[in-house]
Design a protein with these regions (language model features):
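N-terminal amphipathic alpha-helix/helix-capping segment at the start of soluble metabolic enzymes
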Residues: 1-7, 19-23, 94, 102, ...
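Structured beta-strand/loop patches that form or line metal/cofactor-binding pockets in enzymes
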Residues: 1-59, 65
Length: 165
């Protein structure tokens, strides 16, 4: 079970929305695709990740530090102990080699983008929706189709006001 390629691409957000601080009109973000040698329904499993708007693409961090570390890692450094799937915890350790401890905004954005793609790979290999996989791995296996959300109020499109939200 191997990661055979990791690609990063800059994608423009192309949105005219803005809030009190940020206009998204010229912003972009990084999208990552992790391709594995695992086949599901005859196709290689590919996991995708991206980061939230409000930050610019983090290409240099991804392509110069984190992606090369994963590509250089031994298979056992990336897989769970059973060897049946990838391990997000082990991949995180590989990514964070030689990194100063603590949170750093741009670095956490890059790591989170890869982390999302890793979880996508894992759930596709398991043939389970991610929420089901997480409920089984970290909980009692029970899950609900309802979640709490945070509605930010503040992403306004030109010409719209609070009443139109």
């Amino acid at each position: 079970m191997k990661i055979i390629d990791i690609q990063e691409k800059i994608v423009p957000i192309n949105s005219e929305i803005e809030n009190a601080y940020i206009s998204f009109a010229k912003m972009d973000c990084s999208v990552v695709a992790i391709k594995t040698d695992v086949k599901v329904d005859g196709e290689n499993v590919v996991g995708y990740g991206f980061h939230s708007n409000g930050r610019y693409a983090v290409s240099e961090l991804l392509t110069k530090r984190f992606i090369p570390r994963i590509k250089a890692a031994e298979e056992k450094e990336l897989l769970n102990d059973e060897g049946t799937n990838f391990s997000p915890e082990k991949i995180w350790k590989v990514m964070m080699q030689n990194e100063k401890p603590g949170g750093h905004g741009e670095r956490s954005t890059a790591v989170g983008t890869i982390d999302m793609a890793v979880w996508d790979v894992i759930s596709k290999i398991e043939r389970l929706p991610l929420y089901e996989h997480l409920a089984k791995k970290y909980g009692d296996g029970k899950f609900t189709n309802q979640i709490f959300v945070y509605a930010a109020r503040g992403y306004y499109s030109p010409g719209k006001d609070v009443q139109m939200l």
